[in-house]
Swiss-Prot record:
This is Protein artemis. Required for V(D)J recombination, the process by which exons encoding the antigen-binding domains of immunoglobulins and T-cell receptor proteins are assembled from individual V, (D), and J gene segments. V(D)J recombination is initiated by the lymphoid specific RAG endonuclease complex, which generates site specific DNA double strand breaks (DSBs). These DSBs present two types of DNA end structures: hairpin sealed coding ends and phosphorylated blunt signal ends. Interacts with LIG4; the interaction is direct. Interacts with ATM. Interacts with BRCA1. Interacts with PRKDC. Interacts with TP53BP1. Also exhibits ATM- and phosphorylation-dependent interaction with the MRN complex, composed of MRE11, RAD50, and NBN. Its main location: nucleus. GO terms for molecular function: 5'-3' DNA exonuclease activity; damaged DNA binding; endonuclease activity. It holds the Pfam family DRMBL. Residues 503-555, 640-660 are annotated as: Disordered. The modification Phosphoserine is found at S385, S645. Residues 530-543 have a biased composition (Low complexity). InterPro entries: DRMBL, RibonucZ/Hydroxyglut_hydro. Keywords: Adaptive immunity, DNA damage, DNA recombination, DNA repair, Endonuclease, Exonuclease, Hydrolase, Immunity, Magnesium, Nuclease, Nucleus, Phosphoprotein. It comes from the Eukaryota.
Length: 692
């Protein structure tokens, strides 16, 4: 029995399935189906007077419900006030207050409820949100997902409230057999009985006037026997039902009902009192469709249960089971859910407790963040010294990290970049990655640190920057870019280096150029790059390697002492090709300045006491000495040689006197280390140009 009071909180100006008390002031009425518990007050005198005093109050229902309602003379006064709405057709309705003229627009959509002929659900859409009233319904699991009008844009509509049929919202009725299963069980029982003889009759003991039409029509169609009913007036406009029913009592299947006074014919078990014409007694069995009786059973039973000598119970339900209700509500996931029926043996609070977890209002509205999985994160390690690197990865590196210190843009006047470029080189070759580039470049990832192995003496820090260099340094420091392209493997063994000499006036320092550009045998994180802080001079020499792809490593830098620079004794290198050679005997005075050499160039060639000096590759004598004087307008030089011992072109040039050619076994040992990616130890020494 429905306990719905007729009004919804979202749209209180309309009344549904209730037509008395406060509902008399409604602007519109809605009827879901023609069962008496949903028609309270529909033919009351007070409602009749309301209709007589109003011109814009109507009753909305489905076309089948309208036909069923008007077949009864008691409801014919509604004939001019009933408006039928087609199922699954959104219809706009104006709710007008005749006293104040206030108007409200809503859209109503009728959805099939599966309860009885003409039963529908009402979907209301308006300014107060979307609300669904189910009335009495029976929908199988997953059937709501197939209703297109419950969806919008491929997803379920945002429903504010659902007024739900909770007749069997009780765990006792967790699973109710479907109508097809119930029909199959009843059909087999009826067939087995009526086929015995013409005197075997079945009585379907149905208490409701509407709702069993599904059972009647299917039995008649399968067995070819019409079902006897008391009257056919309500089905006269429904030929699909009328064809399977009859008022002739001479049939083997009866669904007739007892009179109101519950009078029984003593000579017959059938309500209609039919007997055989030749006085042969009839063999009658009764089948009572029921659901509540099966819900009270303590153990699972069959669809058909024999309760007496000639009586049976058949499980047949007009309402959704407990599992079907939960499936329907969890799919819609409304904000609120209100029960329309209090199940037998329970209370309203228990029903609300069951429905509440299925609504959005009980769920946390805060977004729940879930991890994407186990991700690699940087590990924080506290260091005592600021000079140590932070390990960004969990796994140790394949080789030990070299200690680095943060790079600071401090100008050191003693360090200059010397580049040798021949004047015979085309203009395009001068703009190689090792040369100055005019466009602004982004700093390399290696430019933030310099190796701790590089030492700056106290004398270098105390010497100031000449005034003549102040103007050039500011404009040059922004014209440099680190070229860290990864070299191809063939670069290690096939190279033709053309080393030339040319005076360039404005050349960027090696520090701003992005540090060492030596081949990366490991990863970018191996920490083996070397950065030299230097300054630019008006005259510098740069070694250009034609065809270099990522082998633009910075070569040895010969640092001039402050005494030699102040006295103006500068070595002049004019149009002469240079290449590195090995020299065993180096004066002690040569160790006063740093000679920074690439780590992959000359390690393990002779011994750790060997170093690199620059000698002419031709027969022209060129010396680096403090007695050599040049004009004072010449700027300081920063000698930078690209010692590439892996290039085969180094040994095709005629040897310089007093130069010692590398031995084959030394080169083989060096190449094997480079090929396997092993690090080459470099021992750096301080030297002075005056000792050369």
């Amino acid at each position: 029995m429905s306990s719905f009071e007729g009004q919804m909180a979202e749209y209180p100006t309309i009344s549904i399935d209730r037509f008395d008390r406060e509902n008399l002031r409604a602007r519109a009425y809605f009827l879901s189906h023609c069962h008496k518990d949903h028609m309270k007050g529909l033919r009351a005198p007070t409602l009749k007077r309301r209709l007589e005093c109003s011109l814009k109050v109507y009753l909305y229902c489905s076309p089948v419900t309208k036909e069923l309602l008007l077949t009864s003379p008691k409801y014919r006064f509604w004939k001019k006030r009933i408006i039928s709405i087609e199922i699954e057709t959104p219809t706009q309705i104006s709710l007008v207050d005749e006293a104040s003229g206030e108007k409200e627009e809503i859209v109503v959509t009728l959805l099939p409820a599966g309860h009885c002929p003409g039963s529908v659900m009402f979907l209301f859409q308006g300014n107060n949100g979307t609300v669904l009233y189910t009335g009495d319904f029976r929908l199988a699991q997953g059937e709501a997902a197939r209703m297109e009008l419950l969806h919008s844009g491929g997803r379920i509509k945002d429903i504010q409230s659902v007024y739900l049929d909770t007749t069997f919202c009780d765990p006792r009725f967790y699973q109710i057999p479907s109508r097809e299963e119930c029909l199959s069980g009843i059909l087999e029982l009826v067939r087995s009985w009526i086929t015995r003889s013409p005197y075997h009759v079945v009585w379907l003991n149905c208490k409701a006037a509407y709702g069993y039409e599904y059972l009647f029509t299917n039995l008649s169609e399968e067995l070819g026997v019409q079902v006897h009913v008391n009257k056919l007036d309500m089905f006269r406009n429904m030929p699909e039902i009328l064809h399977h029913l009859t008022t002739d009592r001479n049939t083997q299947i009866h669904a007739c009902r007892h009179p109101k006074a519950e009078e029984y014919f003593q000579w017959s078990k059938l309500p209609c009192g039919i007997t055989s014409r030749n006085r042969i007694p009839l063999h009658i069995i009764s089948i009572k469709p029921s659901t509540m009786w099966f819900g009270e059973r303590s153990r699972k039973t069959n669809v058909i249960v024999r309760t007496g000598e000639s009586s049976y119970r058949a499980c047949f339900s007009f309402h959704s089971s407990y599992s079907e209700i939960k499936d329907f509500l969890s799919y819609l996931c409304p904000v609120n859910a209100y029960p329309n029926v209090i199940p037998v043996g329970t209370t309203m609070d228990k029903v609300v407790e069951i429905l509440k977890p299925l609504c959005r209002s009980s769920q946390s509205m805060e977004p729940k963040y879930k991890p994407l999985g186990k991700l690699k994160r940087a590990r924080t390690v506290h260091r005592d010294s600021e000079e140590e690197d932070d390990y960004l990865f969990d796994d140790p590196l394949p080789i030990p990290l070299r200690h680095k210190v943060p790079y600071q843009e401090t100008l050191h006047p003693e360090v200059f970049s010397m580049t040798v470029v021949s004047e015979k080189q085309p203009e395009k070759l001068r703009q190689t990655p090792g040369c100055c580039r005019a466009e602004s470049m982004q700093s390399s990832r290696f430019t933030n640190f310099v190796d701790c192995e590089e030492s700056n003496s106290e004398s270098e820090e105390e010497v100031g920057i000449p005034a003549s260099l102040q103007g050039d340094l500011g404009s040059v420091l922004h014209l440099q870019k680190a070229d860290g392209d990864v070299p191809q493997w063939k670069v290690f063994f096939k190279r033709n280096d053309e080393i030339t000499d040319e005076r360039l006036e404005n050349f960027p320092s090696s520090t701003e150029a992005g540090g060492s550009q030596s081949p990366k045998l490991f990863s970018d994180s191996d920490g083996e790059s070397t950065h030299i802080s230097s300054q630019n001079s008006s005259q510098s020499t740069h070694i250009t390697e034609q065809g270099s792809q990522g082998w633009d490593s910075q070569s040895d830098t010969v640092l001039l002492s402050s005494q030699e620079r102040n006295s103006g004794d500068i070595t002049s290198l004019d149009k002469v090709d240079y290449r590195p050679t090995i020299k065993e005997n180096i004066p002690a005075s040569l160790m006063e300045q740093n000679v920074i050499c690439p780590k992959h160039t000359y390690s393990d060639l002779k011994s750790r006491d060997q170093d690199v000096t620059v000698v002419p590759s031709t027969g022209e004598p060129t010396t680096l000495s403090s007695e050599t004087h040049i004009p004072e307008e010449k700027s300081l030089l920063n000698l930078s040689t690209n010692a590439d011992s892996q290039s085969s072109s180094d040994f095709e040039v005629p040897s310089t006197p007093e130069a010692e050619l590398p031995k084959r076994e030394h080169l083989q040992y060096l190449y094997e280390k480079l090929a396997t990616g092993e690090s080459i130890a470099v021992k750096k020494r301080k030297c002075s140009l005056s000792d050369i």
